[in-house]
Amino acid sequence: MHLSQIVLYLSLLIALGPVVLSDQEAHQQPSVSTPVDTDQCATCEVRQQIKTMRLNAIKSQILSKLRMKEAPNISREIVKQLLPKAPPLQQLLDQYDVLGDDNREEVLEDDDEHATTETIVMVATEPDPAVQVDGQPKCCFFSITQKFQASRVVRAQLWVHLRPSEEVTTVFLQISRLIPVTDGNRHIRSRSLKIDVNPGPASWQSIDVKQVLTVWLRQPETNWGIEINAFDSRGNDLAVTSAEPGEEGLQPFMEVKISEGPRRARRDSGLDCDENSPESRCCRYPLTVDFEDFGWDWIIAPKRYKANYCSGECEYMHLQKYPHTHLVNKANPRGTAGPCCTPTKMSPINMLYFNRKEQIIYGKIPSMVVDRCGCS
């Protein structure tokens, strides 16, 4: 190659070099804003993943806290058949209507793993044939679960629905404990209540059966059930003891109030955000759990509640529980994986539900609502 050609080649290389580099930079320039959009999309995806994980965790937690391996197979139609049309149950349902998502206390139980039961409603079933004569009586047996054994019974009320009376009359509501038939005897008279009834619509009446329940708890083998009668002055039995046509949901039931020990309170603080918040730090976000979406018709109330979830970044200095933690992490940054955004305060929810024995339970399930989030 001649010297003149070499000089020309070098001159072109020097002249065109910057132009090529400028073209590359021009092509790369629009991609500068891409990481920002990618970060925003990534944040949305992370939150969505956290919400999905939280919902799945809530399903597992509820079953675990209620000591269930799987959800009871109770459909909406069965719920309508089993749900008593009774005053105390309606009061519990009205409580949810009035209180909504605020029907929980700012406390946590000592047992944070399992549900603390407050009220159990047991619908009467047919007693064992050993205490029946010619298929009678058809009522009433109450299955006493182990839940009672570890609890303190505060109150036990038997609710009986009385058919309407055409005249003013005195009704004697009688409760008799059933025993296996021997020598024609199958009863042990337990309680009797005198009731003055006015003519008019049907009514619910209650009678204290704590003493009867106490006997069953101490001697489970004596629980064969009870017979209920409510005779008026003419000898008519006004008590509804079985679900005859037109009397569905009016069968007797027992309402038991129990207590399971003290509770303890906890306090904390944190940040609250919504889904449109630009906050990148650890924050509490809203999340509504809908049991109907789960297909869980066995939960009577609430049908939905606000569970919330935690999401965000945690710097060593941000919302740490102890001030010295930041100094330790700064001195040894490789000695820890760093704080995570997690719930620092949780509270229970009240729930009315059917268990596997088709008993209606009103209880408090601990640690189901995220009240505060923090880095720990």
From Swiss-Prot:
Pfam families: TGF_beta, TGFb_propeptide. One of its GO terms (molecular function) is growth factor activity. Residues 23-267 form a propeptide. PROSITE patterns: TGF_BETA_1, TGF_BETA_2. It comes from the Eukaryota. GO terms for cellular component: extracellular space. Its main location: secreted. Homodimer; disulfide-linked. Acts specifically as a negative regulator of skeletal muscle growth. This is Growth/differentiation factor 8. It comes from Oreochromis mossambicus. The lineage of its organism: Eukaryota, Metazoa, Chordata, Craniata, Vertebrata.
